[in-house]
Amino acid sequence: MKKIGVLALQGAVDEHIQMIKSAGALPSKVKHPSDLNELDGLVLPGGESTTMRKIMKRYDLIEPVRAFAKEGKAIFGTCAGLVLLSKEIEGGEESLGLIDTTAVRNGFGRQKESFEAELNVEIFSDAPFEAVFIRAPYLIEPSPEVSVLATFEDKIVAAKEANILVTAFHPELTNDNRFMRFFIEKMV
């Protein structure tokens, strides 16, 4: 059984753990660099990206997560995870630089502008995906290596490059585990 870690510093950790279980893998909480050992994949959940980056620095997780990706292991980032994984963050904040695109933090507005929307997702032909956007970012300026998987209002909200998958929305806050299944079955 594949073992998938969830960066457990803040955000929807428990929801991701349930989603990983529903997709047939074994979840594990990651709080320290040694927790990355023996993992097949890693999830960076939503939350507040600046706070997450500061906590990652405090626990010396920045370079170990980069090394995890450079080993070819898969990482799935949702919302703040998307922001952290992007090569650049509009406004110049530090990122992990693991997917060649730029993130626009809170691109769809603040908390009161949170919403749900049906998305047609490139990798799911069976039915639209009901996405939950909370202070959601979006992506701009993807390199040719980045596959755009979904857009909303002409803004990139899901993408993939090599072993990195990102969504601007929160699949873990729905009952639809297709993104997690795709991550575990096709990328890990």
UniProtKB/Swiss-Prot annotation:
Alphabetical keyword list: Glutamine amidotransferase, Hydrolase, Lyase, Pyridoxal phosphate
Gene name of this polypeptide: pdxT
Coiled-coil segments on the chain, per record: none
Active site: C79 (nucleophile), H170 (charge relay system), E172 (charge relay system)
Organism name: Listeria welshimeri serovar 6b (strain ATCC 35897 / DSM 20650 / CCUG 15529 / CIP 8149 / NCTC 11857 / SLCC 5334 / V8)
Pathway, per record: Cofactor biosynthesis; pyridoxal 5'-phosphate biosynthesis
GO biological process terms held by the UniProt record: glutamine catabolic process; pyridoxal phosphate biosynthetic process; pyridoxine metabolic process
Protein name (Swiss-Prot/TrEMBL): Pyridoxal 5'-phosphate synthase subunit PdxT
Pfam families reported for this sequence: SNO (PF01174)
Family, similarity comment: Belongs to the glutaminase PdxT/SNO family.
